[in-house]
């Protein structure tokens, strides 16, 4: 995984400020240590984080880990279970804990 422990903690902390019960996954190229570059792809499974909170969440994450390209998907558990793209992502994703 090409995300430092400190970055992972900061991301998780920022998301959990909005929903303590959420699950946060890193997916995409940052999961593979052999690949270079790439943005930070995050999947958040939350019943509380809505569309309006997503922008403020991105701003907060960038404040904590620095300006980086971040793709943020936020889905409810039901949406995630019904979405084949999300199911594909989760097969290789790493959950931040």
Task: Name each model feature, range by range.
Residues 1-23, 31-37, 46-97:
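Catalytic core of pol beta-like nucleotidyltransferases
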């Amino acid at each position: 995984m090409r995300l430092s422990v400190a970055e992972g903690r900061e991301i998780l902390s920022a998301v959990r400020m909005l929903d303590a019960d959420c699950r946060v996954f890193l997916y995409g190229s940052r999961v593979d240590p052999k690949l270079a570059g790439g943005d930070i792809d995050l999947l958040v499974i939350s019943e509380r984080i809505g569309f309006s909170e997503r922008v403020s969440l991105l701003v907060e994450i960038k404040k904590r880990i620095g300006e980086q390209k971040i793709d943020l998907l936020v889905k409810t558990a039901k949406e995630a279970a019904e979405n084949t793209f999300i199911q594909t992502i989760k097969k290789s994703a790493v959950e931040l804990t």
